[in-house]
Amino acid sequence: NLEEKITLKILRNTNIVVSLGGGGFINEKIRNQVLTNHFSFWLNWNSEILLSRIKSSKKRPLAQNSTNQEIMKLIKKRSKIYSKAEFKINCNKLTKTEIVKKVIKIYELN
């Protein structure tokens, strides 16, 4: 898989920030590499917020032909895997700036 190969190559670097998007952390090889060698953050929003964002995005190929129920099922399934991240940030009531500040603070403390 080309995405896996490229991502694993990128993850060999240090002092980088990588946003893995929807499916990256789902991949077991990628997830293991991240959890072993890097800080990992789960930026968690409630399911309704995620559903709204996914449905309104034109860049979400899985959502184009999916029902709300199917998307919610996928969110629930993926959340179980995302929750394996080292750090979790509840983003429901945070601005982008507040989220960035939290990530930086956690990084600096570790």
Predicted regions and their residues:
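ATP-dependent small-molecule kinase phosphotransfer cores
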Residues: 1-35, 60, 68, 79
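Alpha-helical elements of Rossmann-like donor-binding domains used by nucleotide-donor carbohydrate transfer enzymes
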Residues: 5-6, 49, 98, 102
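NTP-dependent small-molecule kinase module
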Residues: 13, 39, 76-110
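Catalytic metal- and UDP-sugar-binding loop of GT-A-like glycosyltransferases, i.e.
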Residues: 20, 43, 91
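Short glycine-rich anion-binding loops that position phosphate/pyrophosphate groups of nucleotides
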Residues: 22-25, 46-48, 94
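Short amphipathic alpha-helical segments
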Residues: 29-32, 52-56, 101-102
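A glycine- and Lys/Arg-enriched "phosphate-lid" helix/loop adjacent to the NTP-binding pocket
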Residues: 37-80
